[in-house]
């Protein structure tokens, strides 16, 4: 059984056990060089909501132990939206192009190899769908939630946002 991380734990303990935590630090805008500082001190120094950070870290560490209702109450939505936008940027700007480069390196892309070109075409279409989906979230879903948090009634209804979001998911299936 894995234990949850807490605000008093050293941040170095969080990253030493799982390399994925480095990506989470980056997406929250936390840089390395925190030494022996606690999670709380590190997050506060970086202007990151401690509860939101711990919720994401503990969920990634062990999703089976996550209690979604407890998590919702602890999360600062603007902090989570920033994290999600940074995650989208990482995937669209770095991860997807890196996967494509590795595919090209692994495939025989000679003029006579149509299979390689079909694989690349399929990947490019998939990557475009993922990028489109993330762009939709960044331009519609996140602003919708942000306007609700400001107490404004958005011009789009929740049903319109979710219907469009679901249609994007079904396109990629």
Where would I find each of the regions flagged by the language model?
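Small-residue-biased structural context
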Residues: 1-172
